[in-house]
Regions:
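ATP-binding N-terminal substructure of ATP-dependent carboxylate-amine bond-forming enzymes
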Residues: 1-140, 144-150, 157, 168-180, ...
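Hydrophobic beta-strand scaffold residues
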Residues: 42, 133-134, 162, 192, ...
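A short glycine-rich, hydrophobically flanked beta-strand micro-motif that places a catalytic Asp/Glu
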Residues: 43, 228-232, 240-241, 310-324
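ATP-grasp fold ATP-binding core
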Residues: 155-156, 184-202, 226-237
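Short beta-strand-to-turn element immediately C-terminal to the catalytic PLP-Schiff-base lysine
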Residues: 168, 205-210, 244-247, 322, ...
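Phosphate-binding site of ATP-dependent enzymes
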Residues: 209-300, 328
Length: 405
């Protein structure tokens, strides 16, 4: 970098109104440490559990979160402005007086919120309004991948194998639970998995071996989402995961991992509580002990799934596999994987610093591509309406009144 080259300011947004709030703090801490300080200025942007936004140097130290983080000296409240002229954060905003507040410009935003209000397309929509380049999948891909029910339907259309399942709403369950249970019994054989449609990190998920335990599992899942998915449990299968990096047809698949679980499925505790590094510290076998032909097939399914949702950036695609039979089922696509799947990319020859750098480049490429799309269409409709005195609208109203008469 030359003396005249300005470093890129990256806002890393994390925390959030999500059941995966704490997981997000760990992931963001790893992301912020990965940036090359010679190339990037990192701005931590913390979203509290009640939805307030903050920035400040104390947010860079994960030890500060052991106490009330927002009470630390040097923390300022901010809002991410949707107005394109701000291109970043309004610091210490006063209602109705943004012009007197400091504007902290962000060149790129790096979303690191897992699950609701961050990984589901909502934060991405805000960034689209603000016209700020951002890392990762866009609104549509984020929303589709985050919803297990919608993703399953899309992947099925693309001939990517998924596990059989049924879905229903919380209203269906509360209205007639016996009918829902009868439908499950008609459609699926036990054991089954009961899942909220949109949560991650195994939160709200239960494995049910008989109908007697089904009601309690559905109650738990319905507590975390208004829609519930029930899937056949793949007995004798192993979990195998693959990360994807890139956009469009320029995609790369990582080596495979096989998480080591001591439970019937990989629980929240196994993913995060066994170490301070989140998914990075979970037990796993890399590369997964899968034969080369099956490995290539899993990697190809991961790439196809990422293209199907129109993904960009990086994601971790999770599979259930029966290696001895060559059977594969895609379980889910994580567009904001825990620890950003650093461990998979490291084993694939990409360092954490190089990964975040590549993701920033992809974000800027996507933003440049967006600028090729026209969002303005000039017409004379306003002039015509002004000339007519909006008589057309009044006439329509009169027509309605006459029809009612």
């Amino acid at each position: 970098m030359t003396a005249t080259t300005r470093k890129t300011t990256v806002g890393v947004v994390f925390g959030g109104r999500s059941v995966e709030h704490d997981v997000s703090i760990i992931t963001a801490n790893q992301i912020m440490r990965a940036f090359d300080p010679a190339l990037y200025d990192v701005v931590p942007v913390y979203v509290s559990r009640d939805g307030r936004w903050y920035t400040g140097a104390p947010l860079l130290d994960i030890k500060n979160y052991e106490s009330e983080i927002v009470s630390h000296k040097g923390i300022a409240q901010v809002v991410l402005s949707p107005a394109v002229q701000h291109h970043g954060l309004i610091v210490n905003p006063v209602s109705g007086r943004f012009s007197r507040s400091e504007v902290l410009r962000l060149d790129v935003v790096f979303p690191a919120i897992h699950g609701t209000h961050g990984e589901d397309g909502t934060l991405q929509g805000l960034l689209e309004l603000a016209d700020i380049p951002y890392v990762g999948c866009g609104v549509l891909a984020s929303a589709v991948a985050n919803d297990k029910i919608t993703a399953k339907a899309l992947l099925n259309q693309h001939s990517i194998p998924v596990i059989e399942g049924i879905s229903f709403s919380r209203a269906d369950w509360l209205g007639d639970p016996d009918a829902v249970i009868a439908r499950i019994e008609r459609t699926l054989a036990f054991p089954v998995f009961v899942k909220p449609a949109t949560t991650g990190s195994s939160i709200g998920i239960g494995r049910v071996s008989d109908v007697g335990l089904l009601r309690a599992a559905i109650d738990i899942a319905a507590h975390f989402d208004r829609r519930v998915l029930v899937e056949r449990a793949v007995t004798g299968g192993v979990e195998v995961n693959c990360a994807v990096l890139g956009s469009g047809n320029d995609l790369r698949a990582s080596v495979l991992e096989q998480p080591v679980s001591w439970e019937e499925f990989l629980t929240y505790d196994e993913k995060y509580r066994r170490g301070s590094e989140g998914m990075k510290s979970a037990e796993r076998i890399i590369p997964a002990p899968i034969d080369p032909a099956l490995t290539a097939k899993i990697q190809e399914y991961a790439l196809r799934a990422f293209r199907a949702i129109d993904g960009r950036g990086t994601a971790r695609v999770d599979f259930l596999v029966k290696p001895e039979k060559g059977e594969i089922w895609l379980n889910e696509i994580n567009t904001m994987p825990g620890s950003l799947a650093f461990y998979l990319w490291q084993e694939s020859g990409i360092s954490a610093a190089e990964l975040v750098h590549q993701l920033i480049l992809l974000a800027r490429e996507a933003h440049a591509e967006k600028r090729r799309t026209s969002f303005d269409y000039q017409t004379d409709l306003i002039a015509l309406a002004a000339m007519r005195g909006l008589k057309g609208v009044k006439g329509a109203k009169g027509g309605v009144e006459k029809a009612r008469a």
